[in-house]
């Protein structure tokens, strides 16, 4: 049975973990589908959905380059679902600042009508885990793993906030674009990847 073709942008970050989560989501859903790592424009053009994993957002933006970012932007604006995780959320945003250095000037996709603050909870040593609820996604409980995580400081009227922590926005959805501050691939819970798979079906 055929199903959606999901790509994980493999320039940086937890690529294998996200691929594993999508494999689990496909298996649990009992549907067809495939997942692969992608890093060039021609491969992205063939996808039904794209995951942009965590890492260093300024590096990802630089490595991606103009053509790759343009193809992602065109595909997503044409309706392809995208899922940005941590640095991937930053890349999808329309504006980013850093807690320490202010404006970053990094390349952004401007696909989510949000502004974000990088490293909002502090650096690596301030990493933490906490329980979240995403009832609008059908997920009552989810373990959020926050590692040098951003927060969403502004969200436009078309953006649905799907999770908050300490009165801070940490997960949003705008149409077919999903963005989270935390790392769902570092848990044993594929619920959020299953939700994204449904978006791509």
Curated annotation (Swiss-Prot):
NCBIfam families: PLP_synth_Pdx2. Pathway: Cofactor biosynthesis; pyridoxal 5'-phosphate biosynthesis. GO terms for cellular component: cytosol; glutaminase complex. One of its GO terms (molecular function) is pyridoxal 5'-phosphate synthase (glutamine hydrolysing) activity. This is Pyridoxal 5'-phosphate synthase subunit PdxT. It comes from Cenarchaeum symbiosum (strain A). In the presence of PdxS, forms a dodecamer of heterodimers. Only shows activity in the heterodimer. The active site is at residues 86, 183, 185. PANTHER family: PYRIDOXAL 5'-PHOSPHATE SYNTHASE SUBUNIT SNO (PTHR31559), PYRIDOXAL 5'-PHOSPHATE SYNTHASE SUBUNIT SNO1-RELATED (PTHR31559:SF0). Keywords: Glutamine amidotransferase, Hydrolase, Lyase, Pyridoxal phosphate. Disulfide bonds: none annotated. L-glutamine binds at residues 55-57, 118, 147-148. Catalyzes the hydrolysis of glutamine to glutamate and ammonia as part of the biosynthesis of pyridoxal 5'-phosphate. The resulting ammonia molecule is channeled to the active site of PdxS. It catalyses: aldehydo-D-ribose 5-phosphate + D-glyceraldehyde 3-phosphate + L-glutamine = pyridoxal 5'-phosphate + L-glutamate + phosphate + 3 H2O + H(+); L-glutamine + H2O = L-glutamate + NH4(+). Pfam families: SNO. Belongs to the glutaminase PdxT/SNO family. It comes from the Archaea. One of its GO terms (biological process) is glutamine catabolic process. Its EC number is 4.3.3.6, 3.5.1.2. The keyword Hydrolase applies.
């Amino acid at each position: 049975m055929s199903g959606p073709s999901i790509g994980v942008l493999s320039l940086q970050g937890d690529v294998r973990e996200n691929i594993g989560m999508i494999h689990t989501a496909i298996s649990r859903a009992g549907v067809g589908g495939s997942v692969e790592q992608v890093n060039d424009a021609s491969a992205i053009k063939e996808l039904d959905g794209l995951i942009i994993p965590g890492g260093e957002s300024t590096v990802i933006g630089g490595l991606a380059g103009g053509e790759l970012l343009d193809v992602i932007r065109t595909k997503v604006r044409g309706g392809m679902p995208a899922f940005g995780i941590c640095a991937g959320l930053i890349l999808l945003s329309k504006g980013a600042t850093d807690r320490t250095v202010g404006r970053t000037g990094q390349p952004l996709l401007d696909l989510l009508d949000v502004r974000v603050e990088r490293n909002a909870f502090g650096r690596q040593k301030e990493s933490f885990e906490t329980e979240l609820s995403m009832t609008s996604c059908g997920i009552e409980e989810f373990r959020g793993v926050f590692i040098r995580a951003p927060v969403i400081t502004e969200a436009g009227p078309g953006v649905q906030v799907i999770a908050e922590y300490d009165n801070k926005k940490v997960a949003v959805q705008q149409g077919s674009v999903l963005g989270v501050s935390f790392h769902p691939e570092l848990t044993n819970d594929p619920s959020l990847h299953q939700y994204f798979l449904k978006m791509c079906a």
